[in-house]
């Protein structure tokens, strides 16, 4: 079962990216490296509820 999630950068508070994940395969919070236009570099974005 796939669910839609929002990715947030904790330090800047940006919530830029929407993606989906399979809850059965990845029960933990997802962390992905994405580009932050505010900081102009790649940073870690974490799943928020």
From Swiss-Prot:
<keyword id="KW-0689">Ribosomal protein</keyword>
<dbReference type="InterPro" id="IPR011332">
    <property type="entry name" value="Ribosomal_zn-bd"/>
</dbReference>
<dbReference type="GO" id="GO:0005840">
    <property type="term" value="C:ribosome"/>
</dbReference>
<dbReference type="Pfam" id="PF00471">
    <property type="entry name" value="Ribosomal_L33"/>
</dbReference>
<keyword id="KW-0687">Ribonucleoprotein</keyword>
<dbReference type="InterPro" id="IPR038584">
    <property type="entry name" value="Ribosomal_bL33_sf"/>
</dbReference>
<protein>
    <recommendedName>
        <fullName>Large ribosomal subunit protein bL33</fullName>
    </recommendedName>
</protein>
<dbReference type="InterPro" id="IPR001705">
    <property type="entry name" value="Ribosomal_bL33"/>
</dbReference>
<dbReference type="GO" id="GO:0006412">
    <property type="term" value="P:translation"/>
</dbReference>
<dbReference type="GO" id="GO:0005737">
    <property type="term" value="C:cytoplasm"/>
</dbReference>
<dbReference type="GO" id="GO:0003735">
    <property type="term" value="F:structural constituent of ribosome"/>
</dbReference>
<dbReference type="GO" id="GO:1990904">
    <property type="term" value="C:ribonucleoprotein complex"/>
</dbReference>
<comment type="similarity">
    <text>Belongs to the bacterial ribosomal protein bL33 family.</text>
</comment>
<dbReference type="InterPro" id="IPR018264">
    <property type="entry name" value="Ribosomal_bL33_CS"/>
</dbReference>
């Amino acid at each position: 079962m796939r669910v839609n999630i929002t990715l947030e950068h904790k330090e800047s508070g940006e919530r830029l990216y929407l993606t989906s994940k399979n809850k059965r395969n990845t029960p933990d919070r997802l962390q992905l490296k994405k580009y932050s236009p505010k900081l102009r570099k790649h940073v870690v974005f974490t799943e928020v509820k």
